[in-house]
């Protein structure tokens, strides 16, 4: 070390090289430190934006309720929106299985229950299947056991969306009658014929239509959500689900 120090001290050329190398080294360290800081700042920004989106979605639901009551000439002081949204973050996921699952960092302590719908800003994600106090397991659309009611947006024909276990980017809309007009690029949305998802949330877009079957079309749907890039989601709370379920169970139980 002493010899190295003497060489640097008494040799202008070596001193210049050392100085340049040190500048590059410390410059790289500084750049890495900046990148790390920016990463955590970006993470905080994403969390903040996700929380803001939750507030906006809940306010929109309240606005829609207020608008409907005004249009109908009825004012209800204790009115609450049908749907509310709880923010959550993806902490684990699988993509290469036939029965994929997602894990969220919210659970019973956060007001989440089984069979609550999950969506993202891009569209439908899946359905809450299991819970603990602080976590939730979601069965996503890319699980062969997943089925949701969806419809063609332009004509409201409804069918059942089911994944075939092959490609995480695509699913299939079944039970659409053969005579229905469907074109590539048509938008597929939630039908509203369930107590889980509000009507009109984007599911995906028609990729192709198979007309070879006898009575029904087989519609390949490019899913709106890119599951490999999924990060923050909204868990959907239906405030009137229990009332509807109870009424249907009493009057139409078979």
Where do the protein language model's features map onto the residues?
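Extracytoplasmic/periplasmic terminal helices and flexible tails
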Residues: 1-109, 113-254
């Amino acid at each position: 070390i002493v010899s190295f120090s003497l060489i640097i001290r008494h040799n202008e050329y070596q001193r210049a090289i050392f100085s340049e190398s040190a500048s590059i080294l410390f410059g790289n360290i500084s750049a890495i430190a900046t990148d790390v800081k920016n990463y955590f700042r970006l993470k905080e920004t994403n969390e903040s934006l996700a929380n803001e989106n939750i507030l906006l979605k809940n306010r929109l639901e309240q606005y829609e309720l207020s608008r409907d009551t005004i249009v109908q000439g009825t004012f209800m002081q204790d009115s609450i929106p049908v749907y509310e949204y709880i923010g959550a973050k993806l902490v684990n996921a699988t993509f290469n299985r036939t029965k994929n699952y997602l894990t969220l960092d919210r659970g019973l302590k956060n007001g989440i229950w089984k069979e609550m719908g999950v969506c993202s800003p891009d569209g439908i994600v899946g359905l809450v299947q299991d819970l603990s106090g602080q976590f939730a397991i979601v069965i996503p659309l890319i699980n062969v056991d997943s089925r949701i009611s969806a419809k063609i947006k332009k004509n409201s024909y409804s069918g059942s969306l089911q994944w075939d276990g092959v490609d995480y980017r695509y699913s299939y809309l079944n039970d659409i009658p053969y005579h229905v007009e469907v074109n590539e690029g048509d938008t597929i949305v939630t039908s509203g014929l369930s107590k889980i998802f509000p009507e009109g949330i984007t599911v995906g877009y028609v990729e192709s239509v198979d007309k070879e079957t006898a009575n029904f079309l087989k519609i390949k749907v490019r899913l709106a959500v890119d599951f490999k890039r999924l990060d923050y989601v909204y868990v959907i709370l239906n405030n009137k689900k229990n009332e509807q379920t109870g009424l249907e169970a009493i009057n139409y139980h078979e």
